[in-house]
């Protein structure tokens, strides 16, 4: 690729061997050709380090030849055998003798000298048409630093031959330019090169003659008001040089031409050289004030604008043209630097935009460095290229460029800070939650406030690191304090939310603890309901609890449990760095929740089945046990009805007692409204939304405290009373039946008969110590069995054992009979005699039935005992 490119460039340069045509003979400007030529000659990026020279003179006077010898150019020259126009329009070429130095190395040609060969005047091709002469002169004066006037020695003193008409035009044009831009004096150098100078007339005399002509020309032109007394020296500098005849003195011509070429270097004004006194500088011709201050890369556009105004006969306004050029070039430079800027920044913008669409904020690595480097590079490159142009336009465009760049970079910064904000909040939340879970998992305890404060410091430090690494220090939007403040504010809000959630979890744990404690304590109170008299529920020691103070005990247990829970909650909340308002809200919610727990437990214990069971147990404790807690053995002589009535009425008094939550001390409901307290002013709707209404506390619910304390309605109480009475009646009937069944039916004469017939045996037993001791042991065992009410179970066990032995004996007998011949014959005989034996069987069954009827009362007595 490199050799091919080099070959193409060589071909392009060869095509411009004779220079480039700036304006053709038809007054058309060749802008593309000029830009291309300057680029090929490496002048485009020279900035102000270039110089422009134009040559004037009559047609066919050797202007192109002079330029070719001076600057090594290859302008077309007239053939010596023909006298015709060679240069058409205006041509331009770069100095080919660049870097040439004098023999003593004291002088060196300037770099990047551009030479314009202007079409000669007074040519027969244009005849009377002097329009192009005037326009080309105006163009050359507006663009060139040095105007070379090519004149033969013998033409000095002539008007037409010395191009006095053209010079008059130059003077008039210069005044025209001055009027358009009074702030700038468009100074130029008129360099008279006197050709075919033989020295007969001294050069100083020729200078005097030409300067007199210049003064007369200046005086003859019409001047605007205020410039009537101006001098030609106010606008032009003059230098003169004589060259030998090219044909007759070729060697001297070449030598002098080389010597003259070294005059085309940069120089400084010498105050001692005053043209008014006939002293002309022989130093470098390129003074700083001659330069038109048009950068090389904008020359083509500037020249085109100048020529457009000239060719359209518009007043030439160089400041306006310079501003237009500056605007055009600044826009071009801005586009170029923005392309490079886009290459660096667009990928970050796309990544950020994609992350925003996906809802996954991402902190882009390397964004800050890319922003700073791309911004600095773009602004510096723009400054290097555009600062050469009109200052006002440049500054305006620079601000425009900075605004354009900063708008995009600021958007990137905002996106980066937003990403850091969102990701930081998420990471903060996850870190706090993880630390809390870790503390809960290890069971070592944790300080929530310390965790939150530590994570807040980490989050803020990370956010500031991202912000500092992203901001561009030299910009007006480098301050991110507002964003940091918003971030810290949201961190505080999230911290508060996490603290409230943690306090909610703490409250839930405390509520579960309250629920567990109340469940046990309240359950014990209900289980002990009426058990203080006797029975399995009676306490082993101490006084029996009063049934009237049942709700007092429940309330005291409840208050003590909740106070203990409040202390736990307050101690734990202090590690959360919670405010007093938040603690007040938490305690208020705890009291309300605890009341709900108590009420739920009471409702559970007071369900119809549970309450009916407890009432029956209470009744049975009073009915089946005496005041000492000894079980009653019912006898016919006992006042069963009286005991039953007292026990039933005593138990029935529990139903109205349990129907309403009332304290025995005050005969009124507990002060639930005062105990819970008013709703804290800092409570939010979210704090209240999960709380059920409480009668007497939440007045807007329309439920009074009396209604809140009602456990059983009247209908439920009546229904419960009826069912309890039925259950108590069943117990009473059972007791009555037991007492009646225990009465003996043995006649009195039986005891006399038993004594008479068994006297001998009685005496024998009494006289024999062994028999007596055995009788004593049996009597003691019978008494103990009676006292423990074990006769019934013993008799039942004996009957069951005898029945089982009878069944087993029958089974073994049948097996024996079936296994012997005699038995099988007997079975066969019994089968054949089944008909005759049925009546006997019926008799036996009838007898057994009768015996059974006779024995049943005795069996009942045995069971009761």
From Swiss-Prot:
Residues 686-699 have a biased composition (Acidic residues). GO terms for cellular component: endoplasmic reticulum membrane. Residues 1-745, 791-865 are cytoplasmic. It is found in: Endoplasmic reticulum membrane. Residues 673-699, 824-865 are annotated as: Disordered. Residues 478-504, 699-719 form a coiled coil. Its main location: endoplasmic reticulum. Cooperates with the reticulon proteins and tubule-shaping DP1 family proteins to generate and maintain the structure of the tubular endoplasmic reticulum network. Has GTPase activity, which is required for its function in ER organization. This is Protein sey1.
């Amino acid at each position: 690729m490199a050799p091919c490119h080099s070959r193409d460039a060589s071909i392009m340069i060869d095509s411009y061997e004779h220079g480039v045509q700036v304006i053709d003979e038809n007054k058309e400007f060749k802008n593309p050709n000029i830009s291309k030529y300057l680029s090929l000659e490496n002048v485009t990026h020279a900035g102000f380090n270039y110089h422009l020279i134009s040559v004037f003179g009559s047609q066919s006077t050797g202007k192109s030849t002079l330029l070719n010898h001076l600057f090594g150019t290859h302008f077309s020259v007239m053939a010596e055998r023909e006298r015709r126009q060679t240069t058409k329009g205006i041509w331009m070429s770069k100095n080919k003798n660049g870097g040439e130095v004098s023999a003593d190395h004291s002088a060196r040609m300037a770099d990047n000298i551009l030479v314009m060969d202007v079409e000669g005047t007074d040519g027969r091709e244009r005849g009377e048409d002097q329009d192009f002469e005037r326009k080309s002169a105006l163009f050359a004066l507006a663009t060139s630093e040095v105007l070379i006037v090519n004149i033969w020695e013998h033409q000095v003193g002539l008007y037409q031959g010395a191009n006095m008409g053209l010079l008059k035009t130059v003077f008039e044009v210069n005044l025209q330019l001055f009027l358009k831009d009074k702030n700038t004096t468009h100074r130029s150098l008129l360099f008279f090169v006197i050709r075919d100078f033989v020295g007969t007339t001294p050069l100083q005399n020729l200078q005097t003659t030409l300067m007199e002509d210049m003064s007369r020309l200046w005086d003859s032109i019409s001047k605007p008001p205020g410039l009537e007394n101006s001098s030609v020296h106010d606008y032009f500098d003059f230098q003169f040089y004589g060259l030998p005849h090219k044909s007759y003195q070729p060697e001297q011509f070449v030598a002098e031409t080389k010597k003259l070429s070294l005059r085309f270097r940069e120089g400084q004004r010498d105050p001692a050289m005053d043209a008014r006194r006939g002293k002309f500088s022989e130093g470098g011709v390129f003074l700083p004030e001659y330069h038109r201050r048009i950068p090389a890369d904008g020359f083509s556009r500037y020249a085109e604008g100048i020529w457009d105004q000239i060719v359209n006969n518009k007043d030439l306004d160089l400041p306006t043209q310079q501003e237009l050029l500056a605007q055009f070039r600044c826009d071009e430079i801005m586009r170029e630097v923005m392309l490079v800027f886009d290459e660096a920044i667009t990928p970050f913008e796309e990544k950020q935009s994609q992350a925003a669409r996906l809802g996954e904020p991402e902190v882009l690595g390397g964004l800050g460095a890319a922003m700073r480097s791309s911004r600095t590079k773009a602004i510096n490159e723009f400054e290097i290229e555009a600062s050469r142009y009109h200052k006002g336009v440049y500054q305006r465009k620079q601000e425009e460029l900075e605004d354009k760049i900063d708008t995009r970079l600021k958007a990137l910064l905002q996106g980066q800070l937003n990403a850091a904000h969102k990701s930081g909040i998420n990471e903060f939340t996850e870190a706090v939650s993880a630390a809390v879970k870790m503390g809960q998992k290890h069971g070592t305890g944790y300080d929530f406030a310390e965790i939150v404060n530590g994570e807040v410091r980490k989050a803020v430090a990370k956010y500031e690191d991202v912000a500092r690494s992203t901001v561009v220090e030299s910009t007006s939007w480098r301050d991110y304090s507002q964003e940091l403040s918003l971030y810290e504010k949201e961190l505080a809000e999230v911290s508060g939310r996490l603290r409230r959630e943690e306090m909610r979890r703490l409250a839930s744990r405390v509520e579960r603890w309250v629920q567990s404690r109340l469940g046990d304590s309240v359950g014990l109170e209900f289980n002990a309901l009426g058990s203080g008299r006797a029975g399995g529920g009676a306490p082993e020691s101490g006084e029996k609890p009063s049934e009237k103070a049942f709700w007092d005990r429940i309330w005291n247990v409840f208050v003590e449990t909740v106070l203990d829970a409040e202390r736990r909650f307050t101690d734990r909340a202090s590690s959360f760095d919670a405010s007093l308002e938040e603690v007040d809200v938490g305690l208020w919610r705890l009291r309300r929740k605890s009341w709900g727990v108590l009420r739920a437990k009471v409702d559970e214990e007071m369900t119809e089945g549970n309450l009916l069971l407890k009432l029956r147990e209470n009744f049975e404790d009073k009915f089946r046990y005496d005041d000492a807690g000894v079980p009653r053995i019912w006898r016919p002589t006992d006042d069963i009805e009286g005991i039953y009535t007292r026990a039933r009425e005593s138990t029935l008094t529990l139903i109205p007692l349990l129907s309403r939550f009332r304290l025995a001390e005050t005969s009124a409901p507990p002060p639930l409204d005062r105990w819970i307290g008013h709703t804290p002013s800092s409570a939010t709707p979210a704090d209240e939304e999960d709380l059920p209404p409480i009668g007497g506390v939440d007045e807007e619910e329309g439920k009074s405290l009396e209604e809140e304390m009602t456990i059983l309605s009247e209908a439920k109480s009546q229904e419960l009373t009826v069912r309890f009475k039925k259950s108590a009646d069943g117990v009473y009937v059972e007791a009555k039946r037991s007492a009646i069944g225990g009465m003996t039916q043995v006649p009195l004469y039986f005891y006399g008969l038993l004594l008479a017939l068994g006297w001998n045996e009685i005496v024998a037993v009494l006289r024999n110590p062994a028999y007596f001791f055995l009788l004593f042991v049996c009597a003691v065992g019978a008494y103990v069995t009676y006292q423990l009410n074990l006769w019934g179970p013993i008799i039942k066990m004996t009957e069951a054992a005898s029945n089982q032995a009878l069944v087993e004996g029958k089974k073994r007998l049948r097996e024996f009979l079936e296994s012997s011949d005699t038995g099988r014959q007997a079975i066969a005989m019994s089968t054949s005699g089944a008909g005759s034996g049925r009546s006997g069987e019926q008799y036996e069954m009838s007898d057994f039935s009768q015996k059974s009827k006779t024995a049943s009362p005795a069996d009942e007595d045995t069971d009761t005992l």
